[in-house]
């Protein structure tokens, strides 16, 4: 049997979930020789000390401990675990998951180079029922979880069915992840999974969901907090509101990156490759910066008459990190020191002076007056713009309502976006290995 590098990230208030996950690893893995990597991003419950006691059971347990006053965040720490993995095959498990019997044997049976293998989740009824998972309530408290009952349920419900949905837990060859640069640290609280899915598929990796490997998932423990579902918990509900704000900012960054929120259509053959067309916008008569922000995200470049808009937009981009920093308890001072660790939006790369616009060098140009454009065009037109361009066969000049656009070259540029680079971490800011 090949050895797997199981990668688990954890943070504050999760020790009981971690203990349960390790119980399931001990009970349900067929071998204890696999490498287990745990990234402790923050710790307020003695998780590090408890994990040290597990080295006798799991001789290849490797603990990565963040000692900074800020969290790396899961986009970054997943990348770091995969970088540190000793084996060709990596398998990511969230700390609030529980694995079925012979999980390692099953994923090894199905994974191969060029395959992104997703296990099937079993979740409590906190989210809508869906065809991509089992909904079954084994409880919300990890200290009261009946591992034997879950293991029996999983044995009874395993099947050889395969579908194509994408989510954690997942297993793949480490090289496939490294080849596209891993998670983009531009996304700090959500959307990082959708982004990496698009890039993996563009790099000819196929997503396969096996219904033979099952994992219970308490859901949203890391992103929203262990008590996010408790309507009577005021602190948890306040945190949930901040997470929702952070989600909105992440969606804006995703739209800037890919033109709209999308995954590529899921067909019987798997996810289709996404397409992306470079669209430059000449936005005239900008008086309302909030309105401008709601429109500018749909274009890869924006040209404006007033250069001051560039600085104003940079301030808006910088403000977007406030919600994530609040959730991660990162002060403004700490963010100034450590923000270099993450990809960030730079307004001057996207927003430029109208005097610099050479339309002959642009693939596609759209022109409109911001004051005369209604917000309804965002949902009726702009979120579909990439698809509209894709379905437009001829080049030339066209009009749609207040928009005038010219297609000089219809070239799919998605291939240039599949590989990303994240900033290097300074040596003095690296985690320690134990």
PLM regions and their residue ranges:
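A short, conserved alpha-helix in the catalytic core of glycosyltransferases
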Residues: 164-181, 187-214
């Amino acid at each position: 049997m090949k050895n797997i590098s199981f990668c688990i990230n954890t943070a504050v208030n999760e020790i009981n979930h971690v203990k349960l996950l390790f119980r399931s690893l001990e009970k349900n893995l067929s071998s204890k020789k696999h490498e287990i990597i745990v990234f402790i991003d923050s710790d307020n419950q003695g998780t590090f000390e408890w994990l040290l006691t597990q080295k006798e059971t799991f001789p290849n347990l490797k603990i990565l401990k963040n000692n900074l006053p800020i969290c790396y965040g899961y986009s970054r720490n997943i990348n770091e675990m995969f970088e540190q993995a000793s084996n060709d095959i990596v398998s990511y498990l969230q700390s609030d998951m529980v694995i079925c019997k012979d999980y390692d044997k099953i994923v090894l049976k199905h994974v191969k180079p060029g395959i992104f293998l997703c296990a099937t989740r079993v979740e409590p009824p906190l989210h809508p029922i869906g065809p991509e998972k089992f909904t079954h309530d084994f409880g919300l408290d990890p200290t009261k979880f009946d591992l034997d009952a879950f293991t029996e349920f999983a044995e009874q419900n395993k099947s050889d069915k395969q579908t194509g949905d994408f989510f954690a837990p997942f297993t793949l060859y480490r090289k496939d992840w490294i080849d596209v640069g891993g998670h983009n640290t531009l996304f700090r609280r959500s959307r990082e999974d959708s982004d990496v899915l698009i890039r993996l598929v563009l790099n000819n990796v196929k997503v396969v969901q096996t219904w033979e490997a099952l994992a219970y998932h308490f859901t949203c423990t890391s992103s929203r907090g262990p008590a996010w579902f408790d309507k009577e918990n005021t602190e948890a509900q306040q945190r949930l509101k901040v997470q929702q704000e952070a989600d909105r900012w992440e969606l804006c960054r995703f739209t800037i990156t890919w033109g709209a929120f999308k995954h590529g259509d899921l067909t019987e053959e798997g996810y289709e490759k996404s397409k992306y067309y470079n669209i430059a916008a000449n936005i005239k008569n900008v008086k309302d910066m909030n309105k401008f922000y709601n429109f500018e995200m749909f274009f890869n470049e924006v040209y404006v008459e007033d250069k001051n808009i560039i600085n104003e937009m940079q301030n808006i981009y910088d403000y977007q990190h406030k919600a994530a920093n609040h959730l991660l308890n990162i002060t403004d001072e700490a963010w100034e020191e450590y923000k270099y660790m993450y990809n960030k939006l730079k307004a001057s790369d996207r927003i430029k002076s109208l005097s610099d616009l050479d339309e002959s060098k642009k693939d596609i140009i759209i022109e409109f007056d911001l004051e005369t454009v209604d917000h309804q065009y965002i949902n009726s037109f702009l979120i579909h713009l990439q698809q509209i361009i894709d379905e437009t066969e001829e080049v030339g000049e066209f009009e749609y309502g207040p928009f005038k656009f010219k297609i000089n070259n219809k070239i799919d540029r998605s291939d240039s976006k599949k590989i990303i680079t994240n900033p290097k971490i300074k040596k003095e800011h690296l985690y320690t290995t134990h």
